[in-house]
């Protein structure tokens, strides 16, 4: 194999929304999404958190897999484990991202650029896109763009059952 240069990786993550009344907080792209004060009780369920061993931040988790894939260092499960007793249990996605960046550096890689597409009907990512990009970029140490889309009411994200994200990342050998 010749010189490595820039490597690309792709990641995906999906989680089901937690049942209403579960007490789970909604974290996406490193941001907490509180229930708006003006929200009706019926609409408040739309801000229920995401099921998962950690905070369920699909954007952060997809980005983690993309970074690790680019450097050929495994995936989120191989680094943080799976289940309630895993190393990553209860962790916030931003903290996991920072740990991944340190892991990349210790293996001779640095993030160069990344993109995350969040797929779901809620919450409305566009209202906080700049914040999401800033939070993820700060955690990773490179520019991270964030886009959002729906599936026109198709599939589990379209039916409001959950949310997903796809990420691509470039890393450089240092």
Curated annotation (Swiss-Prot):
CDD domains assigned to the protein according to its UniProt record, in alphabetical order: MECDP_synthase
Coiled-coil positions: none
Binding site for 4-CDP-2-C-methyl-D-erythritol 2-phosphate: 13-15, 75-77, 149-152, 156, 159
GO biological process: isopentenyl diphosphate biosynthetic process, methylerythritol 4-phosphate pathway; terpenoid biosynthetic process
Enzyme class: lyase
Pathway it works in: Isoprenoid biosynthesis; isopentenyl diphosphate biosynthesis via DXP pathway; isopentenyl diphosphate from 1-deoxy-D-xylulose 5-phosphate: step 4/6
Catalytic activity: 4-CDP-2-C-methyl-D-erythritol 2-phosphate = 2-C-methyl-D-erythritol 2,4-cyclic diphosphate + CMP
InterPro entries per the UniProt record, alphabetical: MECDP_synthase, MECDP_synthase_CS, MECDP_synthase_sf
Keywords assigned by UniProt, alphabetized: Isoprene biosynthesis, Lyase, Metal-binding
Record PROSITE patterns: ISPF
Cofactor: a divalent metal cation
EC number, as in UniProt: 4.6.1.12
Cofactor binding comment, as recorded: Binds 1 divalent metal cation per subunit.
Residues the record lists as binding a divalent metal cation: 13, 15, 61
NCBIfam families: ispF
Subunit description: Homotrimer.
Function in brief: Involved in the biosynthesis of isopentenyl diphosphate (IPP) and dimethylallyl diphosphate (DMAPP), two major building blocks of isoprenoid compounds. Catalyzes the conversion of 4-diphosphocytidyl-2-C-methyl-D-erythritol 2-phosphate (CDP-ME2P) to 2-C-methyl-D-erythritol 2,4-cyclodiphosphate (ME-CPP) with a corresponding release of cytidine 5-monophosphate (CMP).
Family recorded in the similarity comment: Belongs to the IspF family.
Protein name: 2-C-methyl-D-erythritol 2,4-cyclodiphosphate synthase
Organism (species): Bifidobacterium longum (strain NCC 2705)
Lineage: Bacteria, Bacillati, Actinomycetota, Actinomycetes, Bifidobacteriales
């Amino acid at each position: 194999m010749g010189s490595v240069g820039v490597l690309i990786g792709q990641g995906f993550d999906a989680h089901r929304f937690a049942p209403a009344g579960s007490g789970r907080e909604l974290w996406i792209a490193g941001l907490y999404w509180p229930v708006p004060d003006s929200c009706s009780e019926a609409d408040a369920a739309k801000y229920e958190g995401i099921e998962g061993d950690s905070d369920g931040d699909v954007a952060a988790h997809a980005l983690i897999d993309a970074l690790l894939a680019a450097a050929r260092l495994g995936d989120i499960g191989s680094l943080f484990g799976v289940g309630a007793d895993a190393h990553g249990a209860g962790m916030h996605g931003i903290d996991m991202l920072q740990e991944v960046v340190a892991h990349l550096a210790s293996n001779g890689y640095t993030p160069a650029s990344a993109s995350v597409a969040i797929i779901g009907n809620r919450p409305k990512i566009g209202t906080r896109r700049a914040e999401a990009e800033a939070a993820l970029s700060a955690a990773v140490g490179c520019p991270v763009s964030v886009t959002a889309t729906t599936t026109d009411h198709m599939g589990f994200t379209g039916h409001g059952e959950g949310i997903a994200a796809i990420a691509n990342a470039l890393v450089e050998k240092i």
